[in-house]
């Protein structure tokens, strides 16, 4: 089964032009590497005033993290028999990028790079609710952006329920 753009779109929340990754190059339980050429596209949805700033590479890395979560969840030993709510705790629910830290931008923009982007993420630690990744994005062996990201896998966990009914 090729882990191409079509597969990626079926397994992450972003569709159409907002799906920024073209293929998974490699992955295992701890890390992933993905390729993309969408930074050169004039209709890239992250472009502003005709430019794609380097900070947008964080979104490329975040999508790689989402793909990694989907792959890990799908490869779990009981993935086909585990309930959706339990499977969600190992990566198949929608995750939310909660924070990024120690971000280093080594270039000003991405759209002027001729070579494809490589987005890589490595799981540092995590549990059923949050995951900490180290990420990097580079092009033609040139580092572009790196940092750490916290991903919340179940954003509703631990929040009080909200009563939306009317008051008398």
Language-model region placement:
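Hydrophobic beta-strand-centered segment that forms part of the acyl-chain substrate-binding groove
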Residues: 67-118
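Mixed-charge, glycine-accented linear interaction segment located at domain edges/termini
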Residues: 124-168
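Short aromatic-glycine motifs in intrinsically disordered, low-complexity regions
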Residues: 5-15, 87-91
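Intrinsic-disorder/low-complexity, polar/charged segments enriched in Ser/Thr/Lys/Arg/Asp/Glu/Gln
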Residues: 19, 31-33, 116-118, 130-132, ...
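Hydrophobic beta-sheet segments that form the core/acyl-binding groove
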Residues: 24, 100-140
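Catalytic strand-loop segment that frames the active site of acyl-thioester-processing enzymes
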Residues: 16-53
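Compact, glycine-rich, soluble single-domain proteins
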Residues: 48-68
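RNA-interacting cores
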Residues: 2-9, 36-38, 48-52, 146, ...
């Amino acid at each position: 089964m090729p882990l191409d753009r079509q597969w990626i779109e079926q397994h992450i929340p972003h569709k159409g032009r907002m799906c920024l990754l073209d293929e998974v190059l490699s992955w295992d339980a701890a890390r992933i590497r993905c390729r993309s050429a969408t930074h050169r596209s004039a209709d890239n949805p992250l472009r502003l005033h005709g430019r794609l700033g380097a900070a947008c590479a964080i979104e490329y890395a975040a999508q790689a993290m989402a793909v990694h979560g989907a792959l890990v969840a799908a490869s779990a030993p009981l993935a086909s028999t585990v309930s959706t709510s339990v499977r969600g705790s190992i990566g198949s629910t929608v995750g939310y990028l909660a924070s990024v830290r120690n971000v280093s931008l080594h270039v000003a923009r991405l759209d002027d790079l001729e070579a494809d982007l490589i987005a890589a993420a490595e799981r540092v630690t995590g549990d059923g609710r949050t995951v900490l990744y180290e990420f990097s994005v580079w092009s033609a062996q040139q580092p572009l952006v790196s940092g750490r990201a916290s991903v919340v896998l179940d954003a509703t966990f631990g929040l009080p329920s909200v009563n939306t009914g009317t008051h008398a």
